[in-house]
Amino acid sequence: FLFFVATPFEWLLYFIILITGVSRLFERWSSEQKWPILGNAMYVFWLSFLLFILQFPLNYYKYTLSKSYGISTQHFSSWLKDNVIDFWISFGISVLIVSVLYWLIKKSPKRWWLYAWALTVPFSIFLMFIQPVVIDPIYNDFSPLKDKALETKILSLADLADIPSEHVYEVNMSEKTNALNAYVTGIGDNSRIVLWDTTLNRLSDDEILF
């Protein structure tokens, strides 16, 4: 239920911020900056910070609910740290996107949307390329899979399934959750298969490969 409520709630907050004049207030503060990119950054910061504060109760409730069901093992300080990291990463990406959009609108008022659409593909590919080596390690510790026999089996199975990956990693998710998971991430040389240590600790090789 909370998963389906989160997005409509966020859009409701955007609507309230817009109709109450809070957005104009942020715009007025940001317009005082000499450089446009700094103005964009200030506007995005205040908007993101306000959303962070308003969404915090719902996010905290989801965290406590997960703890009460024994799914999450994460301490509050660690959970809060992850949320702060989320904030700054989202802020940085948003500033970049907004700045590029404003520049495109200024340079081509009639076709800016077409150029923006054309940039979404390379930008998405870039994010997919850097995520396993830049973004993900900020949250957790990744290391090459220690069980080389299992790694060989996984790579053989991946080859049969046409999954282009030559690397298998494990990540210390047991510090945060009891859930099991494995996934493929990245593209090109950064493509990799990742197994949570909870999966490695609780399942046999045959169960993992299944």
Where are these regions (language model features)?
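Polar-ligand-bearing catalytic/cofactor-coordination segments
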Residues: 1-210
